[in-house]
Amino acid sequence: MNGFCIINIDNSIEYIGCVKSVTVERSIHMSHFIDLNSDLGESFGNYTLGMDSEVLNHVTSANVACGWHAGDPLIMEATVKMCKEKGVAVGAHPGYPDLMGFGRRKMAVSPDEARAYMIYQLGALQGFCNQYDVELQHMKLHGAFYNMACVTSELADAVLDGLQAVNPNVRAMVLSGSYIAKEAERRGIPVIQEVFADRGYTEEGTLVPRTEEGAFIKDPQEALERVLMMVQEGKVVTNTGKTIDIVADSVCVHGDNPKAIAFTKYIREGLTKAGVIVANFQNR
């Protein structure tokens, strides 16, 4: 055919000649992107928890404890500074005021309390981000706060109210497919749908409770296969053997001991070998 072609904005190709024009579809290979996040800054005073400097070599986003379930002002500042030096995006990791229970115990809090908890903790970390000229990329709840906000509408609403009060541009990193994820999207809050490399899933899309069989995936190869399935196919096999749909924007990994560091490194290397681009949301 004589003539020329125009590549349209919808990725179709239109051939234009003297006699006729015809439109055909163009096949485009879309690369998969994924973020790797980890909970950091959870030391406190003289007590050291985790291997933050090591895990920062393998993740792209950090969830920084804000002083209530773990962390303190000096740890928060040091973690933000270290993230900047290593090119890792910073996120706030607010929890319940429960140092003794590491924020994993359920608490009965009112919507007003939950909203204030958010403003208090995010505001503190935002101050350190300002000090080092670092963008606060996201917010991810911790422990019981995270789990309860996934299924309790009043709590989720209060959390999002607090987030929007501090900075409406900060992304909400939330459990994929949860109530809080849907409500954040409805409000127009940027959402990061989170999945877990080392946790089992129920048919409802929630995490298998830590006390139940199948809660943890300990074999690195099995974990990698599950992560690749979630990232590339949008599916995960539950603890009953059923396959359900899931959206994966970020994968949570851990780095609180040498074995966990090796696990995280294995996941990242496996993603890269599979052609998945590992990057945070500021570097895309």
Named regions from a protein language model:
Residues 39, 93, 139, 253:
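Conserved, mostly hydrophobic/aromatic
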Residues 170, 264-284:
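C-terminal domain-boundary segment and adjacent tail
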Residues 53-57, 78-91, 130:
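Acidic (Asp/Glu)-rich catalytic clusters
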Residues 177-235:
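Active-site rim beta-loop-alpha module in soluble metabolic enzymes
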Residues 99-132, 138:
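Glycine/small-residue-rich loop that forms an oxyanion/phosphate-binding "nest" at active or ligand-binding sites
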Residues 129-137, 234-245, 277-284:
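Flexible, glycine/charged-enriched surface loops at secondary-structure junctions
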Residues 48, 52, 62-69, 100-115, ...:
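Glycine-rich tight-turn/loop motif centered on a GG-T
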